[in-house]
Amino acid sequence: GPYTPGTAYILLMRPLSLASSSIGAGHDPRRQYLRGSTGLPIGGMGAVTRAMQKSIEASGGTIRVGAGVKQIAAGMTGIEGVELDNGEFIQATTVASNLHPRTTLVDLLSDPLQEPRFKQNVHQLPQRGSVFKLALALDGVPTFTAAPTGLERAYASCQFRLAPSLDYMERAYDDAKYGRPSEEPIILGLIPSLTSPDMAPEGKHIMSCNVWHAPVELTQGSWKDERGKMASRCIEIISRSMPDLKDRIIDYRALSPLDLEDEFGLRDGNIMHLEMMPSQMFGLRPLADCSAYTTPTTGLYLCGSGTWPGGTVSGIPGHNAAQTILSHIK
């Protein structure tokens, strides 16, 4: 919660980004990569992935999809390759993984030289997430009561945040702390189909919401029972600011933390992989032994949200890891 010591670190990300920016980027929020939400890709977040794919293929690279990794194999001199679920073995001396550090270093890596203590330290990394996902299919754009006349559509195209006070946010966290889904959750939402019309049929829209807090383990009941209840509470809360929302809902889909882990590999539903706290940042992310995108296994690199500077879609972990890999190859 906001009153937990160390959580103010998140507020430092903007000044950190500004201080590390070039002079030309000082007044351009799009080039301050830790600043936070500064724009939307046309086509949704999937457009970012598609652009990366085109860039890789244009440079002669090959992308394999639907190819689950069974094992990252290493020998006495380092990485030897990757074994796929279908039994195929791809030889390689360099592997970069943007999976959760624990998934990479504990579940997938087979290294005869890996120290048991290091493996134990990775296994013990604090990773509990508490996010709940809600997607709404809408018939038209809901009315935003706070939008000035004439600016309704402009306001609707921006991200909305429903967390009216620090006390409200702390209460939402307290519920989860004791194993209960938040009665009055924090909600961050967006209608991406306003800026990317191809995401929905004409006249229809999609609202995407990230919701906090939803503990992985519940003290009572199960997420099978609580998923729909949490979704209904979220819709009620959003409706306070958009009174015609319920009338516009065609359908919805809700994902609990367990769903996010099962479908997307987000361990414990943590979209940041690890805690975004000072104890897990800078040279300690994910551990001091592998804080510079390297690992104790020669040729294995980390490049996901479990490395500095953490989650959100900044591209910085991948960029920094690539620079490290290139410096080792030269």
Task: Locate the predicted segments by residue.
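Secondary-structure capping and boundary motifs in well-ordered enzyme cores
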Residues: T4, P41-V48, S97, Q124, ...
